[in-house]
Amino acid sequence: MHCPFCRHPDSRVVDSREADEGQAIRRRRSCPECGRRFTTVETAVLSVVKRSGVTEPFSREKVVRGVRRACQGRQVDNDALNLLAQQVEDAVRASGSAEIPSNEVGLAILGPLRDLDEVAYLRFASVYRSFSSAEDFAREIKELREHRESRDDA
């Protein structure tokens, strides 16, 4: 790690701690050349592999934008959308893979969205799963009802 002050090519780690609920490592470093201290934050890069094969960094904002479209006209606030995006990122990171297929991101969205707002869930699922008929909607509504009943019974 280069020193940001004198550009010396080496530094010594003085202290390491977890940050962002274990998603990052915060390190205090000391430069052997100039003696100044600085902090670095290290995170594992999470990449999404799209259907076309193109790889791009995971973006919580992209998750929020996609879910916000499904929530238009619904009583869902930004805090709830941000929490959902965090849950999706946590679920995707829990897979342990640095590269995750885009369809797995979509699957990770469906569960928290179903619990957040059923109408928004149906809208998102209809696009994500390419519903082509009223039967597709009816099947999904039936599954929603079964999920709600099993959740209420528990």
UniProtKB/Swiss-Prot annotation:
Residue span, ATP-cone domain: 46-136
Zinc finger (unnamed): 3-34
Keywords: ATP-binding, DNA-binding, Metal-binding, Nucleotide-binding, Repressor, Transcription, Transcription regulation, Zinc, Zinc-finger
Cofactor note: Binds 1 zinc ion.
Pfam families referenced in this protein's UniProt entry, alphabetically: ATP-cone, Zn_ribbon_NrdR
PROSITE patterns: ATP_CONE
Keyword Transcription regulation among UniProt keywords: yes
Biological process (GO), any one: negative regulation of DNA-templated transcription
GO molecular function: ATP binding; DNA binding; zinc ion binding
Cofactor annotation: Zn(2+)
Entry superkingdom: Bacteria
InterPro entries named among the record's database cross-references: ATP-cone_dom, NrdR-like_N, RNR_NrdR-like
NCBIfam families from the UniProt entry: transcriptional regulator NrdR
Family, as annotated: Belongs to the NrdR family.
Role according to the record: Negatively regulates transcription of bacterial ribonucleotide reductase nrd genes and operons by binding to NrdR-boxes.
Name of this protein: Transcriptional repressor NrdR
Organism: Rhodococcus opacus (strain B4)
Lineage: Bacteria, Bacillati, Actinomycetota, Actinomycetes, Mycobacteriales
